[in-house]
């Protein structure tokens, strides 16, 4: 993902520090500067962005729907979400329609970012239909969605900067390196113990996702200190 049309870069001091740390990483390309770049990026993201709100809403709906499938079955859950029109549709069509609904058809940059993150998480967990979603581990799903969101957010903010003076292949390699670092930090340490508190009747719990997202930011910030011990 490059910088989207209409995207306005944040101007808070935390983002200035993040930009400097990314510049240092691009010059040095060592483990320490990479860890600091991710840490400063996570710190800047933790100050609050509209993209996080859109993602939390969409991911909360996905989690609630998945839990509903396991406890109430497909048709009842579709009815609870106001989607009786999808009853009888093919499982892959149902999943695509819900993803479109939960992300407002990618109407804004924030919605598009959420859609990219959810789609990436589904691919990572081999979820291609509502049937697959019914059997997924909710902890794994939440962790993958959050990891994908942070990675795509990094791309949104820094793809263009990283690509300056570099080939597409070089840019991809650098971003992949960052993505792997973030994934490694989160997959071992992010344990969403609050997942069982999702309230199906609320049609998703954005507050839960938001809380877990901030836990993820903290892990990424702390991972820099751990890597220097």
Model regions: which residues?
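Extended, helix-rich scaffolding/adaptor regions
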Residues: 1-97
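Long amphipathic alpha-helical segments with strong coiled-coil/leucine-zipper propensity
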Residues: 60-149
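Alpha-helical oligomerization segments
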Residues: 156, 160-229
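Short acidic DE-rich linear segments
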Residues: 1-5, 136, 223-229
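N-terminal cationic amphipathic segment used for targeting or macromolecule association
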Residues: 40, 56, 112, 195, ...
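Surface-exposed polar/charged interaction patches
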Residues: 28, 32, 44-48, 65-68, ...
């Amino acid at each position: 993902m490059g910088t989207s049309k209409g995207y306005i870069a944040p101007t808070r001091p935390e983002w200035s520090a993040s930009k400097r740390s990314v510049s240092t990483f691009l010059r040095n390309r060592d483990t320490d500067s990479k860890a600091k770049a991710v840490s400063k990026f996570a710190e800047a993201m933790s100050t609050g962005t509209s993209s996080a709100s859109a993602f939390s809403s969409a991911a909360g709906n996905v989690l609630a729907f998945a839990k509903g499938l396991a406890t109430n079955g497909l048709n009842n859950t579709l009815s609870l979400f106001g989607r009786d029109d999808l009853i009888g549709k093919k499982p892959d069509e149902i999943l695509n329609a819900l993803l479109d609904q939960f992300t407002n058809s990618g109407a804004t940059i924030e919605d598009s970012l959420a859609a990219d993150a959810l789609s990436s998480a589904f691919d990572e967990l081999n979820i291609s239909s509502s049937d697959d979603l019914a059997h997924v581990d909710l902890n794994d799903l939440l962790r993958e969605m959050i990891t994908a969101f942070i990675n795509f957010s990094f791309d949104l903010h820094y793809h263009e900067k990283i690509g300056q003076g570099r080939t597409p292949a070089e840019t991809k390699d650098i971003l992949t390196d960052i993505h792997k670092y973030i994934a490694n930090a989160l997959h071992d340490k992010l344990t969403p113990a609050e997942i069982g508190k999702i309230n199906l009747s609320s049609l998703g719990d954005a507050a839960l996702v938001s809380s877990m997202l901030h836990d993820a930011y903290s892990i990424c910030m702390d991972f820099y200190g751990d890597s220097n011990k």
